[in-house]
């Protein structure tokens, strides 16, 4: 899903790998279309009504970052296959990497803030801190967005410095992409600079996400356990709302976890890029990315309303 460090100079000729690459591209298109629809639907409502629920603001921001991220990865994939012998840190790939680093960090932080918002608003803990956060969190939304912009920009600049230094070293020593000395310098920089920076950048939002997810699942479990003791049980509207939220959160968590693992595996070089196992893993990741927008479409009331209005307009009903 990341497309961060594809090692160029090798080609995929195996028929199975070619099929997986084709499936991967189709899944990317589905993910782009799904996130594009979410962004357009909520974005238009935001512009027309001049207001939107804080949760939906985070959702449209996440959809927009996902949409742009998928587009950048698609562009990088096309460039890699058109120019397989290009140096991984040439100006074109540096430009694409700059966009990818920013959008990747933005996606992680938007996902994290959305999980924080779900946890605070849906969880039924009686601790005074939760009651205080319920009243304050909505007003903090602009600062949450500004903080993600600042953190994403800062880490993107650090990544760009490392990438640019490797390219300058490549030009200075007239190294070839397959040169042993050049590869050793790249490996040293990637191992002792880029990899630790990536782990710090990616682990911070992931840790917050997991804490919020555990708290929310614990709260929902307690609430549904109490509901079983009532006469209405799972037919209680509040319980059904919690179940829908839990399903949406679980799909969200699966996508987040798979995305985080893909970043770590790619940075650690566990799956050799352009290898068959690499494409199998990428296909699984993008399957989650393609399914998640569909789940959001049916779990979000505003998005469901947009779908119903589109259906009614196509059928010619008022």
Curated annotation (Swiss-Prot):
Subcellular localization: Membrane
Topological domains, Cytoplasmic: 29-40, 110-128, 205-234, 286-318
InterPro entries the record matches: TAS2R
PANTHER family in alphabetical order: TASTE RECEPTOR TYPE 2, TASTE RECEPTOR TYPE 2 MEMBER 60
Family listed: Belongs to the G-protein coupled receptor T2R family.
Record flagged with keyword Membrane: yes
Primary location recorded for the protein, binned into one broad class: membrane
Entries under Pfam families matching the protein: TAS2R
Leftover remarks: Most taste cells may be activated by a limited number of bitter compounds; individual taste cells can discriminate among bitter stimuli.
Matching SUPFAM superfamilies: Family A G protein-coupled receptor-like
Membrane-topology descriptor: Multi-pass membrane protein
Gene Ontology cellular-component annotations: plasma membrane
Name of the protein described by the UniProt record: Taste receptor type 2 member 60
Glycan attachment residues as annotated in the record: 179
Keyword Secreted applies: no
GO molecular function: bitter taste receptor activity; G protein-coupled receptor activity
Function: Receptor that may play a role in the perception of bitterness and is gustducin-linked. May play a role in sensing the chemical composition of the gastrointestinal content. The activity of this receptor may stimulate alpha gustducin, mediate PLC-beta-2 activation and lead to the gating of TRPM5.
Native source species: Pan paniscus (Pygmy chimpanzee)
Record Gene3D superfamilies: Rhodopsin 7-helix transmembrane proteins
Keywords, ordered alphabetically: G-protein coupled receptor, Glycoprotein, Membrane, Receptor, Sensory transduction, Taste, Transducer, Transmembrane, Transmembrane helix
Transmembrane feature ranges: 8-28, 41-61, 89-109, 129-149, 184-204, 235-255, 265-285
Spans within the Extracellular topological domain: 1-7, 62-88, 150-183, 256-264
């Amino acid at each position: 899903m990341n497309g961060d460090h594809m090692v160029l100079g090798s080609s995929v000729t195996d028929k199975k790998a070619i099929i997986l690459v084709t499936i991967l591209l189709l899944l990317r298109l589905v993910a782009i279309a799904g996130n594009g629809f979410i962004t357009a639907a909520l974005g238009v409502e935001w512009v027309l009504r001049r207001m939107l629920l804080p949760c939906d603001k985070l959702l449209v921001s996440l959809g927009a970052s996902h949409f742009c991220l998928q587009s950048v990865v698609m562009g990088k994939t096309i460039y890699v296959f058109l120019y397989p012998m290009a140096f991984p840190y040439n100006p074109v790939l540096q430009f694409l990497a700059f966009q990818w680093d920013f959008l990747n960090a933005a996606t992680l932080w938007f996902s994290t803030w959305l999980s924080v918002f779900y946890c605070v608003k849906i969880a039924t803990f009686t601790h005074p801190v939760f009651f205080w956060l319920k009243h304050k969190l909505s007003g903090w939304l602009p600062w949450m967005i500004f903080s993600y912009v600042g953190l994403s920009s800062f880490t993107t600049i650090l990544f760009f410095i490392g990438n640019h230094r490797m390219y300058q070293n490549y030009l200075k020593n007239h190294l070839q992409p397959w040169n042993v000395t050049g590869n050793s310098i790249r490996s040293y920089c990637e191992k002792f600079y880029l990899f630790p920076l990536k782990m710090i950048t990616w682990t911070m939002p992931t840790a917050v996400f997991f804490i919020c997810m555990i708290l929310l699942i614990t709260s929902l479990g307690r609430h549904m356990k109490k509901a079983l003791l009532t006469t209405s049980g799972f037919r209680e509207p509040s319980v059904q709302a919690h179940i829908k939220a839990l399903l949406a959160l679980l799909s969200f968590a699966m996508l987040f976890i798979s995305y985080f693992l893909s970043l770590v595996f790619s940075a650690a070089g566990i799956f050799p890029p352009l290898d068959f196992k690499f494409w199998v893993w990428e296909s699984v990741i993008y399957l989650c990315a393609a399914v998640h927008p569909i789940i959001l479409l049916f779990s979000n009331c505003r998005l469901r309303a947009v779908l119903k209005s589109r259906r009614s307009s196509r059928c010619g009903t008022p």
